[in-house]
Amino acid sequence: MDKGEAEQIVSHQDLSEDYQKPLQTCKNKCFCKKCCYHCQLCFLQKGLGVTYHAPRTRRKKIRSLNLAPLQHQSISTKWGRDGQTTPTSQEKVETTAGSN
């Protein structure tokens, strides 16, 4: 066995050990070609766009100050419509009904 074959066997063993290790997270946010291909995890995430978890979305908080007065009002006043008719509208209805 010469020196070249021994180095090749050692490098082969190093590579097989590297594949047995779990993938380590990379803190690099760069998407250049060098950074995308420097490790298997970066290639999957940056180069191919594969993610194994969905990004967390934040829900918008509802302001409790605006909802507190609305909860104590009736439904008809919340939307700006009165459920009861006013005396002037009743008079208009009577006059239009009487003219027909």
UniProtKB/Swiss-Prot annotation:
Motif stretch (Nuclear localization signal, and RNA-binding (TAR)): 54-60
Keyword set, alphabetical order: Activator, Host nucleus, Host-virus interaction, RNA-binding, Transcription, Transcription regulation
Where does it localize?
Host nucleus, Host nucleolus
Region of interest called Core, as start-end residue ranges on this chain: 43-53
Extract the ranges annotated as region (Disordered). 76-100
Q: Where is this region: Cysteine-rich?
A: 26-42
Identify the main location: host cell
Q: Which GO terms describe its biological process?
A: positive regulation of viral transcription
Q: Which GO terms describe its molecular function?
A: RNA binding; RNA-binding transcription regulator activity
Which parts of the chain are coiled coil? Answer: none
**Recorded superkingdom:** Viruses
Role according to the record: Transcriptional activator that increases RNA Pol II processivity, thereby increasing the level of full-length viral transcripts. Recognizes a hairpin structure at the 5'-LTR of the nascent viral mRNAs referred to as the transactivation responsive RNA element (TAR) and recruits the cyclin T1-CDK9 complex (P-TEFb complex) that will in turn hyperphosphorylate the RNA polymerase II to allow efficient elongation. The CDK9 component of P-TEFb and other Tat-activated kinases hyperphosphorylate the C-terminus of RNA Pol II that becomes stabilized and much more processive. Extracellular circulating Tat can be endocytosed by surrounding uninfected cells via the binding to several surface receptors. Endosomal low pH allows Tat to cross the endosome membrane to enter the cytosol and eventually further translocate into the nucleus, thereby inducing severe cell dysfunctions ranging from cell activation to cell death. Through.
Q: Which family does it belong to?
A: Belongs to the lentiviruses Tat family.
> What protein name applies here?
Protein Tat
Q: Which organism is it from?
A: Simian immunodeficiency virus agm.vervet (isolate AGM TYO-1) (SIV-agm.ver)
